[in-house]
Structures are given as structure tokens and as C-alpha cells.
A protein has these predicted regions:
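Glycan-recognition and catalytic cores of secretory/periplasmic carbohydrate-active enzymes
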Residues: 1-185
């Protein structure tokens, strides 16, 4: 019963009613290809289309149960990947602008070691996530391909290096039964 509070009830209602931007259908990407870096393999376009700010170019924010708004890196990366797919499909300038904004945010907010501080608001002792690292790298590789700035590629490489670094060294990879497993934090 600890999780039963007005914040979670609202969150669950939005999820069940199909109005949550955090919980959208994520089938196979609409223009995903195994042969080319283009569309993302998950369909994240609803992350962009369902948002309140469809006609605005701004970084998405997450509202915490205490009412505070934070920028959650995974949400930014998924929004950017969805915007890029929409740009590839529709060729609308608004989508490439949203995509570029998220890629620039990723550059500006990446730590020196290649990480993004993903769970700073609820788990500051273990704020890193392999999911954030992978999605951030995916966003930045597409930004490099589309926009040509070498800084995007360099940041993607740093993100992957951090993702495969062992947890004991600060990264997000665990060794279990001789296999490397990426950790969600």
C-alpha cells in the first residue's frame, strides 16, 4: 500500500487511459532497417505526437510526485528518436528541429566520463542506466549521420564506452556467470 498515493493513481490512470506520454505503444519502428542507420527499431513517434507541445520545440520534462519538474535523459532521448523518425517520414522542419534540440541537449549534459545522470532525482547513489547510455548513443549517432557534426559521434563513442564499463568502475555493465549484462540502475 506504500505506493498507493494520488500521484501514482494519476500516473496509473493516464497509463490505462492511453494518455501518458511515458507509456506509449512501442512496436517495431515504422522505418527501421537492419542495413542502415535511420529510423529507430522501436516506434517512439507517439512520445512526440501525444505531447502537449507538439508545435513547440522544447525539451520534454517529467513531473515528480512532489510537483518538481526534471529533465529525465531517457525521456529526452526517446523524444528525439521519435522526432527523427517523424522527420524521416514526413520531412517537416519542426521534427528535425526537435531532433537537433535533443541531440544538442545530450551533448551539453553528458558528463566528462560519457555518462548521463539519469536517476539523480530518485537514486543518486546509482544514477546511471545502460538504457540511457544506449538510447543516448543511438540519438547521437543519428545526429552525426544527419547533421554531420563530429562532436555527436565523439559523444556517442563516450556513451558506449561508459555503458560497457564495469559497474565496479562506475559504468553500467555487470559480469554474471561469465556473461556481460548491462544494468538498468
Amino acid at each position: 500500500m506504500r505506493n498507493l498515493n494520488i500521484y501514482n493513481i494519476r500516473k496509473w490512470y493516464k497509463m490505462l487511459a492511453g494518455t501518458s506520454i511515458l507509456h506509449v505503444n512501442q512496436g517495431v519502428g515504422k522505418i527501421y532497417s537492419k542495413n542502415d542507420i535511420g529510423g529507430y527499431y522501436n516506434d517512439l513517434t507517439e512520445k512526440v505526437l501525444r505531447g502537449k507541445n507538439l508545435q513547440k520545440v522544447k525539451i520534454p520534462r517529467l513531473q515528480l510526485k512532489n510537483g518538481q519538474e526534471v529533465v529525465f535523459p531517457i525521456a529526452v532521448f526517446q523524444y528525439g528518436l521519435g522526432a527523427y523518425d517523424l522527420y524521416l517520414i514526413e520531412k517537416k522542419e519542426i521534427y528535425i528541429n526537435k531532433f537537433k534540440l535533443t541531440a544538442d541537449w545530450a551533448l551539453a549534459n553528458q558528463e566528462e566520463n560519457g555518462a548521463w545522470n539519469n536517476f539523480f532525482f530518485n537514486n543518486p547513489e546509482a544514477p546511471f542506466s545502460a538504457m540511457a547510455q544506449g538510447e543516448g548513443a543511438s540519438l547521437l549517432i543519428r545526429a552525426y549521420k544527419q547533421l554531420g557534426m563530429i562532436e555527436y559521434l565523439e559523444a556517442a563513442e563516450k556513451a558506449i564506452e561508459f555503458m560497457i564499463m564495469p559497474v565496479g568502475d562506475g559504468g553500467t555493465t555487470l559480469l554474471r556467470a561469465g556473461a556481460h549484462v548491462v544494468d538498468e540502475g
